[in-house]
Amino acid sequence: MSAGATILARGALVGAALVAAGCGAGPAVVARDGAGHEVASAALPASGEFALTYRHSVYKTAAEERFRATDGGFVLDSIASRDGRVLDYYELDGARTREGALWVLRPDRPARFETMPLAATRRGQRTLVAGTRHVPLYGGPVHLKLVVEQ
């Protein structure tokens, strides 16, 4: 194989590996710091669904905010926790159901975001979940902005 063909073959292998690792084209959820630098990201599954998990500061229990990517941003589809008081904390009207051990609130009027500011503290342990990826957002800058990028 010529040197040029070897370089092309290696480039194709690297490109395939990046796509397989979720680093290729396609929408992703990205967390940026105050200066706009990327702190963390995760490729979105085909469904466009992702979540933020965290430890609630008042009730000291796990909670999950579930989102879905849309054209130009994302929507809060539901909030889930083992402790129903977490759902009360949001003060949103909507349908409450059970999913196994979890209480789930589906807001009547889901909040829509282009970007969403959030605090990522060690205490809250905020984590981005997209597909099978769990990306901790805490341990670096505290004040972040979440955005869906195409």
Could you say what each language-model-derived stretch is?
Residues 1-12:
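Bacterial N-terminal signal peptides that target proteins for export
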Residues 30-83:
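N-terminal secretory signal peptides
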Residues 11-20:
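Bacterial N-terminal signal peptides
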Residues 10, 82, 86-89:
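Generic hydrophobic/packing signal
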Residues 50, 68, 75-78, 88-150:
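Mature, soluble, non-transmembrane domains
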